[in-house]
Amino acid sequence: MQRITYLGPEGTFSEAAMITLRTTGRIPGSSEVEPVSVASAREALVQVQAGDADYACVPIESSLEGPVVPTLDTLAVGAPLQIFAETVLPVSFTIAVRPGTAAGDVKTVAGFPIAAAQVREWLATNLPDAELVAANSNAAAAEDVKAERADAGVCTEWAAQRLGLHALASGVVDEAHAHTRFVLVGRPGPPPAATGADRTSVVLGLGNVPGALAAAMNEFAIRDIDLTRIESRPTRTGLGTYRFFLDCVGHIDDIAVGEALKGLHRRCEDVRYLGSWPRGTTAPTGANPPVLDEASGWLAETREGRLR
């Protein structure tokens, strides 16, 4: 049985993402899973690094708020980790209250910071005088309401139902079509086979020399590889020192992507490969890398003196 950590407690979007990955057969190995709820995305990943869990299911990107910083920072340091799968979930929230609570009774609202940011306008319009208090997760916000530590909570519908809370409002989100991307992370191993609709991710450490970032980007540009995400995060070793997170369309087994990764290894102080895996959405996301088999064949013939 495989042990999978996720940002808990029960009733979070992370749990829903883990269930989606399990029911769609995207968790490598045994289909028998032991879900383990933990208090943070960082803890979920650290347990995998320590060998106390086989995989972690954690959020990595919000369409409204961008990168999930604790996930990025933990992926970049410590024992190597690798992403094996992803899923994208539509996101909306329930504003949960204890039975009998009206909007006028709400003085405090518990919310996971990423979730609270996605309903900021709704709260300002409908609960303008309420104080926002931080919760460890969406489900923890519901538990804060149940325990009377807050009058209302920004949570998932199923977290509210599980605790017998009522919905002051349902389907709340400031922007329509909000989504969050979740990834399944394990210790390094062979990546899933290429599907033709894949994503590859790396973390780069660059030297403090002119043009270092441009040179790294050029490894993708000269091969017509589409970059879909570029993020920078401080290394925490001093001011002005950053590492860069890059996602591109394609798979390490694609010739163009493989050549780009070799180029990065030559140019960069450090390259941490985070994996190649099938994209979690069927919507087109960038252009696939070019097929270089013909070019490779031409080069082989030229080396043999068979000029065309």
UniProtKB/Swiss-Prot annotation:
Pathway annotation from the record: Amino-acid biosynthesis; L-phenylalanine biosynthesis; phenylpyruvate from prephenate: step 1/1
InterPro entries, per the entry: ACT-like_dom_sf, ACT_dom, Chor_mutase/pphenate_deHydtase, Preph_deHydtase, Preph_deHydtase_CS
Gene3D superfamilies cross-referenced by the UniProt entry: 3.30.70.260, Periplasmic binding protein-like II
Alphabetical keyword list: Amino-acid biosynthesis, Aromatic amino acid biosynthesis, Lyase, Phenylalanine biosynthesis
PROSITE patterns noted in UniProt: ACT (PS51671), PREPHENATE_DEHYDR_2 (PS00858), PREPHENATE_DEHYDR_3 (PS51171)
GO biological process, one term: L-phenylalanine biosynthetic process
Enzyme Commission number, as recorded: 4.2.1.51
Keyword hit for Membrane: no
Catalysed conversion reaction: prephenate + H(+) = 3-phenylpyruvate + CO2 + H2O
Record-annotated site: Essential for activity: T180
An annotated Gene Ontology molecular function: protein homodimerization activity
Gene Ontology terms: cellular component: cytoplasm
UniProt domain Prephenate dehydratase: residue ranges: 3-187
ACT domain boundaries: 201-278
Subunit structure: Homodimer.
The protein's name: Prephenate dehydratase
Organism: Mycobacteroides abscessus (strain ATCC 19977 / DSM 44196 / CCUG 20993 / CIP 104536 / JCM 13569 / NCTC 13031 / TMC 1543 / L948) (Mycobacterium abscessus)
Taxonomic lineage: Bacteria, Bacillati, Actinomycetota, Actinomycetes, Mycobacteriales
